[in-house]
Amino acid sequence: MVSAATRKSLLRARVMDFITSTAILPLLLGCVGLFSLFKLLQWLRMRAYVRNAVVVITGATSGLGRECARVFHAAGARLVLCGRNAEALEELSQELAASRAPGVQTHKPCTVTFDLADPGAIAGAASEILQCFGHVDVLINNAGISYRGAIVDTSPDVDKRVMETNYFGPVALTKALLPAMIRRRQGHVVAISSIQGKISLPFRSAYAASKHATQAFFDCLRAEVEQHDIEVTVISPGYIHTNLSLNAVTADGSKYGVMDETTAQGRSPVQVAQDILAALGKKKKDVVLADPMPSLAVYLRTLAPGLFFRLMASRARKERKSKHS
């Protein structure tokens, strides 16, 4: 009598014999090969989109901005690195200038030092940016600041500080560079927003408000500049493993100084930077780069708002309790 294990073994052998003796295996291998070739061609096309393009990156010296600089430099972009720290900008510029990418001509980045939160610095910075390579092909509004605190305890000055950095600064810089793009009938404006530009989490009010404003402004901009052949992409990442929470401001304006667990477990900034390059190459309009649960919350907010609000209230209670325990 043949045992069950033997029958399974025989059946498995017959299936493998069938696969290898027919066209199924070559067909499967062919499909895998075609898919791999498609992905390779797609990646090359995305890199070609920014090759020799003038790409401006704000907040370039740390976190996601720094990784975007590395990824776009390796793709052959001519970078204009922007930030507040001249020494850090020059250090990054030297690092990139010394690096090489196989099969790609790379370029020494230009640096422009200014504070995005200073309204008086924007016009001069925009002029300096345009002088670097003569024009701008891609503007990546990446610089930003995060916030942690209860609304009732938060100073209006903190709200203004977050809005100045996350909203008014990027808007002012975009407006300053936009006329040059319109004249050339060419350009791509990118806003690095957040999943919190689509949903609001408790104890993140100033940050969420600034990102909701960012989403709204750049959605309007997209519609208005379409006639000039200018692309606008809003990127909404979830948690990224950077120092964003460490450098966040609190209700009284002091530094938060804590690496949140969700941030520590967030996606690699390198991976997010690569996804941003891919989104630009595909000329996507609105992209959410988040894990399934945060992405689901965006739909839940629309489809089942009552449930979403209850979940947020529960989250607020838990967070409040953990702070007082």
Curated annotation (Swiss-Prot):
InterPro entries listed in its UniProt record: NAD(P)-bd_dom_sf (IPR036291), Sc_DH/Rdtase_CS (IPR020904), SDR_fam (IPR002347)
A Pfam family hit: adh_short
Entry's Gene Ontology molecular function annotations: oxidoreductase activity
Residue ranges annotated as Lumenal topological domain: 39-325
E.C. designation(s): 1.1.-.-
Cytoplasmic-side segments: 1-17
Cellular location(s): Endoplasmic reticulum membrane
Active-site feature positions: 207
PROSITE patterns according to UniProt: ADH_SHORT
Sorted UniProt keywords: Endoplasmic reticulum, Membrane, NAD, NADP, Oxidoreductase, Signal-anchor, Transmembrane, Transmembrane helix
Listed CDD domains: 11beta-HSD1_like_SDR_c (cd05332)
Coiled coil: none
Broad enzyme group: oxidoreductase
Residues spanning the membrane: 18-38
Gene3D superfamilies recorded: NAD(P)-binding Rossmann-like Domain
UniProt: NAD(+) binding residues: 62, 64, 207, 211, 242
Disulfide bonds: none
Residues involved in substrate binding: 194
Record's bilayer topology term: Single-pass type II membrane protein
GO CC field: endoplasmic reticulum membrane; membrane
Membership in a protein family: Belongs to the short-chain dehydrogenases/reductases (SDR) family.
Protein function: Putative oxidoreductase.
Protein name as catalogued: Dehydrogenase/reductase SDR family member 7B
Gene expressing this chain: DHRS7B
